[in-house]
Amino acid sequence: MNNILITSAGRRVSLVRFFQKELKSVFAEAKVFTTDANPDYASACRISDGYFKMQRVTEPNYIDDLLQLAIKNDVKIIVPTIDTELLILSKNIEVFKSKGIEVVISDYEIMKIFRDKRLTHQFFEKYGINCAKEYSKENYQLPIYIKPYDGSRSVDNFIITTQEQLTDYHFQNDKLLFLEYLDHKKHTEFTIDLYYDKNSDLKCFVPRQRIEVRDGEVNKAVTKDAFFIPEIWKKMQHIDGFRGCITFQVFVNLDTQQIFGIEINPRFGGGYPLSY
């Protein structure tokens, strides 16, 4: 049986339904299963073909338990959905592959890059994509944007426009980066869904203009045929180690049309239903 398992499904109802529709069009008897720490209260679990309570990814037996669950339920593909799963699952790709199970995820070395925004900026520079300037805490130019190099969901993010807004916390917290501020009034924000095959070749490209964001995740957006598609496609048409869905966030300057890379999340994003 060619079943699929979507981990940490949470509220991703549309994602589960899309996988059900596409999977059953090929394998009519196949099922889409889900896991969650609290599956009885996870809407995506309730509409899946079966769900399982799974310990948190930080628990020592997480990989072993997930592997046994997949084997027991004839799962051939695992689809992770949250940032905290990515490193450990990518590190264990071969463990699952040895049992005939594919984890839809990029290589471990790729995951390490995108868990650190400093390395992400280096990635952008390598592929000829502009990004916000990084300032030292001794030499910066207001306004600045402050965020942790390993953060997510907009936690500990600050827009600083005056010197008085800066505190000891900003200077003493080694995780906080001082960055050039890209004013939302002067830029349009896009998230691009990039889809890579097993050979790390780009197969599909869908840009979405972000209209409303909640806790760092898109809440409202519209799919658009953007002018920058050929440029980004050319620069990112093959990235060694990329597989599956990659969500790429960019700002586009309204006056100059200059593109700035903001961050990359190597997983299905919250706005995926607009790409489907």
Spell out what each predicted region is.
Residues 1-104:
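ATP-binding N-terminal substructure of ATP-dependent carboxylate-amine bond-forming enzymes
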Residues 160-240, 251-260:
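Phosphate-binding site of ATP-dependent enzymes
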Residues 248:
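Catalytic phosphate/metal-binding cores of nucleic-acid and nucleotide-processing enzymes, i.e., regions
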Residues 28, 47, 74, 130, ...:
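Short loop/turn motifs at secondary-structure junctions
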Residues 40-42, 86, 109-113, 213:
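Short gly/pro/ser/thr-enriched loop/turn and capping motifs at secondary-structure boundaries
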Residues 154, 211-221, 265-275:
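Glycine-rich phosphate/pyrophosphate-binding beta-alpha loops
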